[in-house]
Regions:
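A conserved catalytic-core signature of glycosyltransferases
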Residues: 36
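S-adenosylmethionine/decaboxylated-SAM
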Residues: 8, 26-28, 39, 43-163
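Rossmann-like AdoMet
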Residues: 1-33
Length: 163
């Protein structure tokens, strides 16, 4: 696990405020719900060697790719059950189904990085297709950075996860 200090995060935020990170226009423009500033911040924070990044609610993968881009030793774990999409008319997928467009777009975004020296080490990215509540977190390695991007969420759900 990498060591992230308060000073590191402050410097990462200052860089992100100025639009500075390792991200290219490609990563900045991937469709997703995160802002360019947030992607830059996550990319900068995850630049510490051997960082472990968890994203709950990976959606289409743009923020997770920002964590991985240019950070060769960063381990990225993304969790999503692909059952809720606030951009769909029926936000919740019918029982027994997922929003397959979300999952296929996430897979397509990852597939863009399968060839050549492209800034992303796909072997360091793991996608868990599950509700985060169903994962036995005691069996997971610890994470240095957690991006909890789940909608809808309530305070007790958030508190239960982090306690």
């Amino acid at each position: 696990m990498g060591k992230i200090t308060k000073e590191w995060v402050q410097a990462a935020l200052k860089l992100a405020d100025n639009g500075q990170s390792k991200l290219t226009e490609r990563e900045r423009e991937l469709f997703g719900l995160s802002s360019e500033r947030l992607r830059c911040l996550i990319n900068n924070v995850c630049a510490v060697k051997d960082i472990s990044y968890l994203e709950i609610g990976i959606y289409r993968g743009s923020t997770a790719l920002a964590a991985a881009y240019g950070n060769d030793t960063t381990r990225v774990v993304g969790v999503d059950n692909f059952k809720y999409d606030e951009r769909e008319p029926d936000k919740w997928a019918p029982e027994g189904f997922i929003h397959s467009n979300m999952k296929s777009q996430m897979e397509a975004n990852l597939a863009r990085y399968t060839t050549g020296d492209n800034g992303v080490t796909l072997d360091n990215i793991e996608i868990i297709e599950s509700s985060f509540e169903d994962i036995d977190w005691d069996k997971q390695k610890k994470f240095d950075v957690v991006f909890f991007d789940v909608v809808p969420v309530n305070t007790s759900l958030y508190d239960d996860f982090f306690n």
